[in-house]
Structure formats: structure tokens, C-alpha cells
Design a protein with these regions (language model features):
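Short, charged beta-turn/beta-strand-edge "cap" motif at the junction between a beta-strand
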Residues: 49-56
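Hydrophobic beta-strand signal
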Residues: 47-48, 63
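A generic structural signal for short beta-strands and their flanking turns/coil linkers
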Residues: 20-23, 42-44, 58-60, 92-96
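Compositionally biased, charged N-terminal/linker segments
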Residues: 1-42, 140, 151-154
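A cross-family signal for N-terminal binding/gating loops and helix N-caps
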Residues: 1-11, 57-60, 77, 81
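Charged phosphate-binding loop/patch that engages nucleotide di/tri-phosphates or the phosphate backbone
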Residues: 132-154
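Aromatic- and Lys/Arg-enriched surface recognition patch
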Residues: 60-131
């Protein structure tokens, strides 16, 4: 699961990109970075979650479209994601490209997830679990699709 604030970058923004693909920049939390750098592989499926929105919701699915690579914004002094300690030789921050699979016609809200008995262990609803990138268990992936009325992507 990857979170984005829709006023910064929404699922509609992703849909409007060339090939419905973009890079997922700006991760500046080590645990989230490690998920992206060490656990994500090309073809892995991802939920797109709108955070700081009304309602908070899983709004669709994407897939990883590249191997992890250094986030170029860390080297750009004009970027809000600039990191003066990062160097080309020793980058600190990584990203992957993501490609839209499907925008849900019926997003699944955080409140709906909290009410679903089988999703009580989902990191998204755990107190203090604010990471912008989070793992999702296979049964959670399947249940969210069921709740959205969507078939599982290939």
C-alpha cells in the first residue's frame, strides 16, 4: 500500500500520466524506504491510498514498473526533498516507478476497513502506523478487492 495526499498527487494524476506511469518520489522515512528498496519487485501489486482526504480511502491499484533506483530529488537543492547528506555515490533515498492498474469505482474507506473483522491486523488501521508505504497480507488484498466489488488483477 502506498499513500499519497490527493492535493499533492492523486490517482487521477497517475491516470493522466504518459502510459499511466510515474516515479514515486519523496519517501523520507527509512522504514518506508526499506520496504520500497528491499521488498518491491517489478510486477508487484500495490494499493493506492488517498491520505489526508475525505474520506480516507483505498482508491485503486497500481503495480511496480521498475527496479528501485536513487530518488533524483535528493540531489536537487531546489527540491523540497533535497538531502544535503545524500551523494550520487551514496544515495540515501530510493524510489520505484508505478503504473496504474485500476481506479476503483467504489473506493474502500478507512472506516469500512476498521469495521471489517478480517482486516483488524491490517497495518493501515493500527495506532501509530503512519508509514507512507506499508505491506499488505494476501488475505487483506483479496478482502479489499471484494469490498470494492473489483476482481483481483492478474
Amino acid at each position: 500500500l502506498m499513500k499519497s495526499e490527493p492535493y499533492e498527487f492523486s490517482i487521477d494524476d497517475l491516470a493522466s500520466r504518459k502510459n499511466q506511469t510515474t516515479y514515486w518520489e519523496g519517501i523520507r522515512n527509512y522504514q518506508a524506504r526499506n520496504f520500497m528498496r528491499d521488498k518491491m519487485n517489478i510486477g508487484d501489486k500495490i494499493f493506492f491510498y488517498h491520505s489526508r482526504a475525505k474520506p480516507l480511502a483505498i482508491v485503486g491499484t497500481m503495480e511496480v514498473a521498475s527496479e528501485p533506483y536513487p530518488d533524483p530529488s535528493q540531489f536537487d537543492p531546489t527540491s523540497k526533498y533535497f538531502d544535503e547528506k545524500a551523494t550520487e555515490e551514496k544515495p540515501r533515498w530510493f524510489l520505484v516507478d508505478v503504473k496504474l492498474i485500476k481506479k476503483f469505482e467504489r473506493p474502500v474507506t478507512r472506516d469500512q476497513i476498521k469495521e471489517e473483522e478480517s482486516l483488524q491486523e491490517m497495518m493501515l488501521i493500527k495506532k501509530g502506523a503512519r508509514l507512507s508505504i506499508q505491506p499488505v497480507a494476501p488475505h487483506e488484498w483479496e478482502k479489499i478487492h471484494e469490498m470494492a466489488g473489483e476482481p483481483l488483477p492478474d
